């Protein structure tokens, strides 16, 4: 049985970057559930399935096999055998990940795979409902957040560094829309687990936040 750390929080809070750093420091496996949803979002997008047709999204998701492999320390995400690691980081695929994540059949499709990985390894898993639904018995639970404006600022800088010219206002509006969708969906809405540590990173560097995660993990072992 692995030692499991669950990190939940809203879009753009830096969960992935912080979890990755902490996992490296602890020599744990980092499981990016968001990347799994992005991969399915990409597949649904390619198939031109309407966003509002949840039945079709659920059926289309069943055609996918998503896996994560680490090659020379770098994470690679595979969709039906194709490496989609770069393509899933695009902004419109982030939007699609939020759409498919609200569909029960999609969540069910990924749940067993995520739990199996956690059972067999020491892991840090981040997402929207890890501590509340996927790993309710995780050894450490953290709710990691930052203000919507700070999250939009970070995301805007990241997009600019990749040559993406999406305006800040559009990024902020998208983050607020995703917050609303994630907290109001019927299945596993985003919320802090009762036994989770609340960690606001608005005024922290990524390194400071990762160090806090490592500290919490070591205290719990």
Region roles according to the model:
Residues 12:
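Walker A (P-loop) phosphate-binding loop of P-loop NTPases
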Residues 69, 114-120, 132-133, 137, ...:
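Small-molecule kinase domains that catalyze NTP-dependent phosphoryl transfer to phosphate-bearing small molecules
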Residues 85-162:
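ATP-dependent NMP and nucleoside kinases share a basic, alpha-helical "lid"
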Residues 15:
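Conserved lysine of the Walker
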Residues 7:
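Hydrophobic anchor at the beta1->P-loop junction of P-loop NTPases
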Residues 34, 81, 110, 124, ...:
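Residue-level signal for inorganic ion chemistry
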Residues 18:
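Hydrophobic positions on the alpha1 helix immediately C-terminal to the Walker A/P-loop
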Residues 25-90:
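N-terminal phosphate/diphosphate-binding loop that engages ATP/GTP or pyrophosphate donors
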